């Protein structure tokens, strides 16, 4: 071994990570690295880069959970190498999955299953759950049309202002999306416009129980009743799928009198995010069908499980089982009582913010975060004809300088001239944290007032509604 090799070896063994040779070069980003490096150095490089991400706890744009207790981290670590799709190899994880399906079905008032096991599945998130619910709708509709001897080449789906996953579903599965556009004073699907869009080629109607733009509920019951009348008048029977990405784990606990779920006979399936208000870590969603008849069997694949067969219906395959296991932990840990307390706390924060922000400017509130109105979100716009000397984009940009990610964006459809600001209140965004946001909000308003030349220059460049 020559002197240089000895020096290099000594460096690798003894040098501190910030004195190591491998940290004195820029990390590879375009080509696969040629050489190995010390694990502590590789970790340090990546760890330092992650500091440039936003602080997840201050992200008030996301609907997703940004706080998990230590036990969730432990369970995720224990499950990192358990493959969710391998039911035979990990039977207890599979059993936990089935228990969660039963619990969610019970929460949403699904009819008691004939064999004791509810019909549903875990997914990577509510978007995959929507895809599966949409596929089942299309297959059921196609079967009915074929039985009636009618063509099946022009399916359509009727919805209000939906999350982009429904646009993807329509494109991927060749379905015409008839989206009822937002318009001033009418920001979600109403029965009249819904019925005008329906015909015998409608595979289903999809209300969003927690509209992503504003946080308001698109209440399913009036739409359901209108479809009953439509069937009585035309003979056309149309199913419903409820996209309850956020509301599915809120209303059962804080607004149980809202009839939105399987209590409505036309509702054949419901999807929701476990990793939003289900309180699970990222990567967990659920879709539940009313019964076995609502899920066409040709979409189900059977895999080995405990010496027998179990049906699976999913788009994704290999992924860790930790998210499902963590969801089960939250169900056991909190129960109905605990979920009610956690969700009520978020609504209390939303109500407090709405009351305080209303005092600070000429705002018109679209959602004030009341349990009977929608999810715990505060959404507002500047009142028509008012010019406070700043835009909501300016305000969003100033708050970002303090780490707060509070989006300002335009609405969709025929309301693209309306700019709103939306604040999501979730577990971990407690009252004291909300008070700190208000202090920075007031400081931002003062800064904009003191620097009028800076007003109106910020653009919608920090948030894209998807």
From Swiss-Prot:
Cofactor names = pyridoxal 5'-phosphate
Residues with the modification N6-(pyridoxal phosphate)lysine, per the entry, are 276
Please list the residues that carry the modification N6-acetyllysine.
Answer: 446, 453, 464
- Please give the PROSITE patterns that the UniProt record associates with this protein: DDC_GAD_HDC_YDC (PS00392)
Q: Which residues bind pyridoxal 5'-phosphate?
A: 126-127, 212, 275
- EC number in record: 4.1.1.15
Gene Ontology BP annotations: glutamate catabolic process
State where substrate binds.
Answer: 62, 83
Q: Name one GO cellular component term.
A: cytosol
GO molecular function list: glutamate decarboxylase activity; pyridoxal phosphate binding
Q: Which InterPro entries match?
A: Glutamate_decarboxylase, PyrdxlP-dep_de-COase, PyrdxlP-dep_Trfase, PyrdxlP-dep_Trfase_major, Pyridoxal-P_BS
Q: Which Pfam families match?
A: Pyridoxal_deC
Q: Which reaction does it catalyse?
A: L-glutamate + H(+) = 4-aminobutanoate + CO2
Q: What induces it?
A: By acidic conditions. Expression is regulated by a complex system involving RpoS, cAMP, CRP, EvgAS, H-NS, GadE, GadW and GadX. The level of involvement for each regulator varies depending upon the growth phase and the medium.
Entry keyword set: Acetylation, Decarboxylase, Lyase, Pyridoxal phosphate
**Assembly information from the UniProt record:** Homohexamer composed of three dimers.
The entry's family comment says: Belongs to the group II decarboxylase family.
Q: What is the stated purpose of this protein?
A: Converts glutamate to gamma-aminobutyrate (GABA), consuming one intracellular proton in the reaction. The gad system helps to maintain a near-neutral intracellular pH when cells are exposed to extremely acidic conditions. The ability to survive transit through the acidic conditions of the stomach is essential for successful colonization of the mammalian host by commensal and pathogenic bacteria.
Name of the protein in question: Glutamate decarboxylase beta
């Amino acid at each position: 071994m020559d002197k240089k090799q000895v020096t290099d070896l000594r460096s690798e063994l003894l040098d501190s990570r910030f004195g190591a040779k491998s940290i004195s070069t820029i990390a590879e980003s375009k080509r696969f690295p040629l050489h190995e490096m010390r694990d502590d150095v590789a970790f340090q490089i990546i760890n330092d880069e992650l500091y440039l991400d936003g602080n997840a706890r201050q992200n008030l744009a996301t609907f997703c959970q940004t706080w998990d207790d230590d036990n969730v981290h432990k369970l995720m670590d224990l499950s990192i190498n358990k493959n969710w799709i391998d039911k035979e190899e990990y039977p207890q994880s599979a059993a936990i999955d089935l228990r969660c399906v039963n619990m969610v079905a019970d929460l949403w008032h699904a009819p008691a299953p004939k064999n004791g096991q509810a019909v549903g599945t875990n997914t990577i998130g509510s978007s995959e759950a929507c895809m599966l619910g949409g596929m089942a709708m299309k297959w059921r509709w196609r079967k009915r049309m074929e039985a009636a001897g009618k063509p099946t080449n022009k399916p359509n789906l009727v919805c209000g202002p939906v999350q982009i996953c429904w646009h993807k579903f329509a494109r991927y599965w060749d379905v015409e999306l008839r989206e009822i556009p937002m318009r001033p004073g009418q920001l979600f699907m109403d029965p009249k416009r819904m019925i005008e869009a329906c015909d015998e080629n409608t595979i289903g109607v999809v209300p969003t129980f927690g509209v992503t733009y504003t946080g308001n509920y698109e209440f399913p019951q009036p739409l359901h009743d209108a479809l009953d009348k439509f069937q009585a008048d035309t003979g056309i029977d149309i199913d419903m799928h409820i996209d309850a990405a956020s509301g599915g784990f809120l209303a059962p606990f804080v607004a149980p009198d809202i009839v939105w779920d399987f209590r409505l006979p036309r509702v054949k399936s419901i999807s929701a995010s476990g990793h939003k208000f289900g309180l699970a870590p990222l990567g967990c969603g659920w879709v539940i069908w009313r019964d076995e008849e609502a899920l066409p069997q040709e979409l189900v694949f059977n895999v080995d499980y405990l010496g027998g067969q179990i049906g699976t219906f999913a788009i994704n395959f290999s992924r860790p089982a930790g998210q499902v296991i963590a969801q089960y932990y939250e169900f056991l840990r909190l129960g109905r009582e605990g979920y009610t307390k956690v969700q009520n706390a978020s609504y209390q924060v939303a109500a407090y913010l709405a009351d305080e922000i209303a005092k600070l400017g000429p705002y018109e509130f679209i959602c004030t975060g009341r349990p009977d109105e929608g999810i715990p979100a505060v959404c507002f716009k500047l009142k028509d004809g008012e010019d406070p000397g700043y835009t909501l984009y300016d305000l969003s940009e100033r708050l970002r300088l303090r780490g707060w990610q509070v989006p300002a964006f335009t609405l969709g459809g025929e309301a693209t001239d309306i700019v709103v600001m939306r604040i999501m209140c979730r577990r971990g965004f407690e009252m004291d944290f909300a008070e700190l946001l208000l202090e920075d909000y007031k400081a931002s308003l003062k800064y904009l007032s003191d620097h009028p030349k800076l007003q109106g220059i910020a653009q919608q460049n920090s948030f894209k509604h998807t």
